[in-house]
Amino acid sequence: MTEILDGKAVAKTINEQTKARVAKQKRPVTLAVIYDPSNDGSQLYVGMKSRQAAKLGIVTRDIPISTDATTESVIQLVEELNDDESITGILVQSPLAKGIKERQIFSAVAPHKDADGLGATVQGMLFGDSLENYTVAATPQGVMTLLAQYNISLKGKNAVVVGRSQLFGRPMFALLTNADATVTLAHRYTEPTTLKALLKNADIVVVGVGIPNFIQGEDLKKGATVIDVGMNVVDGKATGDVNFSSAQGIAGYITPVPGGVGPMTIATLLENTVTLAEQHQ
């Protein structure tokens, strides 16, 4: 029988803890969010984050970039926020407008304000397993918290991460490696027969490539833990990268879409923000 990993329930607990921590701060906890207002998905996500932040007592400053924004102008904006003592954390909501070099923007965020852990300094510390005073990218850290909540062991397990983005795949690989899993990083261009062989041997599968039903139940090892980071819309409904129905009865644990990783990402981002406030009071 497949057990559902309830991200909503775990996120609720995290949010309650975050709210209590925010209440103890002497100064307002403020998250600046830079985003492209022409992207409907970004507008949706920014709105969701802002509403949840307000419930926890976190102030958000949503900053839409103009249609004529350049990499240089966005970096200048980030540097101004770095110097603004009223700003606790900074989030750069991806994707930004075409032509803007996102990695340069991520790395312009000061490490002590990097709420989503996407800058080169923070990600370098993550790969060096030296993250004592830094936050981790919210989605992969949320996955790790969810696994821990369900007491899913990682030590010595074969794990496959499908997706290599800076937001998800690369930090996910590092976190699982640091937790003593044996990790393989695959992606949408991995040769299909190679990917199928990897999946059949994987105790842990974490996938986020943005392709609906990219992985089928028949691809999975019996009893595997399957974490679906994908969020796609098919016929007006949210759909993950894993064919959920076909994985039933094969996976030991699985996250639903929606209600799995999504709530954990937002909860972890806001948890990261109050952590930054505590570290730099």
UniProtKB/Swiss-Prot annotation:
Keyword terms, alphabetized: Amino-acid biosynthesis, Histidine biosynthesis, Hydrolase, Methionine biosynthesis, Multifunctional enzyme, NADP, One-carbon metabolism, Oxidoreductase, Purine biosynthesis
EC number(s) reported in the record: 1.5.1.5, 3.5.4.9
Gene Ontology biological process terms in this record: L-histidine biosynthetic process; methionine biosynthetic process; purine nucleotide biosynthetic process; tetrahydrofolate interconversion
Disulfide cross-links: none
Subunit (UniProt): Homodimer.
Organism of origin: Leuconostoc mesenteroides subsp. mesenteroides (strain ATCC 8293 / DSM 20343 / BCRC 11652 / CCM 1803 / JCM 6124 / NCDO 523 / NBRC 100496 / NCIMB 8023 / NCTC 12954 / NRRL B-1118 / 37Y)
Superkingdom of origin organism: Bacteria
Binding site residues for NADP(+): 163-165
Protein name: Bifunctional protein FolD
Pathway: One-carbon metabolism; tetrahydrofolate interconversion
Classification via PROSITE patterns: THF_DHG_CYH_2 (PS00767)
PANTHER family noted in UniProt: C-1-TETRAHYDROFOLATE SYNTHASE, CYTOPLASMIC (PTHR48099:SF5), C-1-TETRAHYDROFOLATE SYNTHASE, CYTOPLASMIC-RELATED (PTHR48099)
One Pfam family recorded for the sequence: THF_DHG_CYH
Family statement drawn from the similarity comment of this UniProt entry: Belongs to the tetrahydrofolate dehydrogenase/cyclohydrolase family.
GO cellular component, one term: cytosol
